[in-house]
């Protein structure tokens, strides 16, 4: 009798648990439908205000809400196939049912999406959170610690929701309104150029007609005469043939004229200089010379103590030749060479000693002395008076 009573109590408990499970499924479906309906309404409101946001995912959310129902129904088992000793599961189902019954008022309340958040993420997160707490305690015997998952559902909604930034697509602006828009520096430069040439707007028929005209009148359109290269030669046809050609020259550092351009034509007859006949060597033509200022007046002045710093043997420049005269000057007289008296004999002896010093130091003075005869000095004769007897 006790075994029969225990069996009846077990069957009755399982029937009660089955009713609780049905209530749980009904609560799940009601909550999913409310969340889906709220998400669809928010998507419609948000899509009307923005044209570039993504389309509302109402179909996705409905499919995701049906998926947990079908997945959760897999956990329903026949009470006849279960084992004994499942009295703890009934109490746990009661706790889960009470928790789920308390969730719909909080989750079904629709909140306006904050600025920058994607409204379509709300139903996805809600349905994702509803998939996990449905794993009921079956033969494997899940503990009560893992049954605390439904309590963290509002926390997941707050933590996993990340803002998503979207950019509006740039509207295409017609080319006709480009000139009215503000331009940068290079845009202003490109716009100021006259790129609207009338020739570029002509049709192909115009260019074909122009080509046929040039082929028919080739002699008039194309000129092969050398006069076309130098059109100024036609103006010089009235110049007399006996004129003197004028060419441009430049004086080099050695004071020799150099032509600026050997192929430059004459400004009167147009004949290049390199085409002149050999008679110009016998009778030179008139030239126009440009002398650089550095040849006439050097930009720097030469100092006397630096007269040995250049070689003036291969130049015709006048300032450099003048500096050569400093080499043949006699040295300056020293203070000790000044005669101490105006006696004639002392002056003559001092001059002879000075000449000997110059001949020993300066060879040019020796050559100059050989040309000039030395001065002749004679002892003055004094007339003696003889006494008369």
Swiss-Prot record:
Residues 71-80 have a biased composition (Basic and acidic residues). Keywords: Phosphoprotein. Inhibits glioma cells invasion and down-regulates adhesion- and motility-associated genes such as NFKB2 and ICAM1. Exhibits opposing effects to IGFBP2 on cell invasion. One of its GO terms (biological process) is negative regulation of G2/M transition of mitotic cell cycle. Interacts with IGFBP2. Residues 44-80, 131-150 are annotated as: Disordered. The keyword Lipid metabolism does not apply. The gene is Miip. It comes from the Eukaryota. This is Migration and invasion-inhibitory protein. Residues 58-70 have a biased composition (Polar residues). Residues 44-54 have a biased composition (Low complexity). The keyword Aminoacyl-tRNA synthetase does not apply. The modification Phosphoserine is found at residue 309.
């Amino acid at each position: 009798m006790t075994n029969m009573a225990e069996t009846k109590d077990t069957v009755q408990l399982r029937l009660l648990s089955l009713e609780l499970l049905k209530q749980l499924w009904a609560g799940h479906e009601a909550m999913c439908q409310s969340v889906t309906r709220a998400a669809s309404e928010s998507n419609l409101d948000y899509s009307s205000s923005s044209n570039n946001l993504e389309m509302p995912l109402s179909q996705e959310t409905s499919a995701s809400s049906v998926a947990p129902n079908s997945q959760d129904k897999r956990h329903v088992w026949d009470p006849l196939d279960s084992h004994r000793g499942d009295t703890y599961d009934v109490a746990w189902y009661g706790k889960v049912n009470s928790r789920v019954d308390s969730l719909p008022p909080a989750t079904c309340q629709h909140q306006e999406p904050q600025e920058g958040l994607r409204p379509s993420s709300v139903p996805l997160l809600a349905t994702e959170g509803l998939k996990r707490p449905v794993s009921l305690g079956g033969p494997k015997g899940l503990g009560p610690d893992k049954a605390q998952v439904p309590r963290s559902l509002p926390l997941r909604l707050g933590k996993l929701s990340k803002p998503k930034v979207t950019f509006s697509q740039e509207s295409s602006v017609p080319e006709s309104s480009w000139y009215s828009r503000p331009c940068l520096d290079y845009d202003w430069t490109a716009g100021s150029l006259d790129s609207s040439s009338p020739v570029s707007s002509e049709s192909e028929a115009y260019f074909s007609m122009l080509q046929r005209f040039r082929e028919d009148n080739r002699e008039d359109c194309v000129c092969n005469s050398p006069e076309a290269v130098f059109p100024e030669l036609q103006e010089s046809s009235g110049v007399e043939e006996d004129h003197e050609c004028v060419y441009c020259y430049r004086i080099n550092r050695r004071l020799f004229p150099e032509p600026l351009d050997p192929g430059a034509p004459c400004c009167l007859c147009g004949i290049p200089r390199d085409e002149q006949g050999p008679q110009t060597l016998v009778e030179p033509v008139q030239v126009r010379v440009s002398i650089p200022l550095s040849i006439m007046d050097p930009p720097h002045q030469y100092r006397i103590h630096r007269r040995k710093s250049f070689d003036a043997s291969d130049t015709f420049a006048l300032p450099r030749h003048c500096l050569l005269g400093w080499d043949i000057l006699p040295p300056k007289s020293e203070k000790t060479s000044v005669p101490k008296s105006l006696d004639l004999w002392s002056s003559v002896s001092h001059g002879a000693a000075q000449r000997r010093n110059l001949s020993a130091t300066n060879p040019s003075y020796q050559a100059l002395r050989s040309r000039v005869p030395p001065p002749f000095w004679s002892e003055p004769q004094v007339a003696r008076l003889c006494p008369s007897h």
